[in-house]
Amino acid sequence: MSAPTPETADNSDSARSSLEALRTEIAKAVVGQDPAVTGLVVALLCRGHVLLEGVPGVAKTLLVRALAASLELGTKRVQFTPDLMPSDITGSLVYDARTAEFSFQPGPVFTNLLLADEINRTPPKTQSSLLEAMEERQVTVDGTPRPLPEPFLVAATQNPVEYEGTYPLPEAQLDRFLLKLTVPLPTRQDEINVLTRHAEGFNPRDLHAAGVRPVAGPADLEAARAAVAKTSVSPEIAGYVVDICRATRESPSLTLGVSPRGATALLSTARAWAWLTGRDYVIPDDVKALALPTLRHRVQLRPEAEMEGVTPDSVITAILTHVPVPR
């Protein structure tokens, strides 16, 4: 592999600094939740989409809004409700009486960063309207394909399935999300910090007043993606990823293991994480760091395992413990 030129290295370092600065900006609005912030940045680098899951009130929506405010990108929000229609997301043809013609009115999906809020509160038919947009980066209305802007990222939030009024996401749609990030309740100290901020006048609806500013733009993102694409992967690392994913298919606790698409996703996220940490090659720790968020939504538990308290995370963690690590 040829050595990078000084100019290429400078561009890569500048892009890395810009994306690292996102953390600082988001921290002005969101206390803690660093793993979720990291996951959002990784998804941007991998051209992927993110599902954020947590109980109501843990700043899932605020986290995505802070990311949008930190980027020089267009953003729109859709609040998913039981009566939301697919055309409310993709857009529709509207009759213009003056011209006696139908014209296309784009829906909120025509943006760079789409916040799909509480995506599991709407029926599957509407959920599936995002499928083509997420996978093909286009929507088809009245037989006409319409490309979406680039970059395009769907950041969806959902409440745990056991909450009233939720619809489990179809497996096909879950697989379209690069990462599923769990947003836990804050620690005691983080919760104290949240209350202190609010007592000092923090308004989550006014991120500009909180000091959140754009620190990265499309050019930074393209430079970063180009650098990630050059991050090298040894045959041993590729084999390690495959062994982890094949082990999920053989687990007695699972009815559904990770597909080859999931293995590709794990390798992609590991490369992005390696680059973010300052390396141009992937090591096993990069794979381990992204295994849970990349794989937890791509496996399905057997009912008897679920009744015994087994979770996708515990199965994947056990697999990481037993699969031999390349040296």
What spans do the regions from the language model cover?
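Canonical AAA+ ATPase core
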Residues: 96-101, 122, 134-231, 271-273
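Pre-Walker A (pre-P-loop) alpha-helix and adjacent loop at the N terminus of AAA/AAA+ ATPase modules
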Residues: 13-58, 246
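Walker B catalytic acidic pair
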Residues: 54, 117-118, 129
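Conserved beta-strand position immediately N-terminal to the Walker
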Residues: 50, 114, 152
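Walker A/P-loop
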Residues: 44-81
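P-loop (Walker A) phosphate-binding loop of NTP-binding proteins
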Residues: 55, 89, 157
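Conserved alpha-helical scaffold flanking the Walker A/P-loop in AAA+ ATPase domains
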Residues: 39-42, 95-115, 144
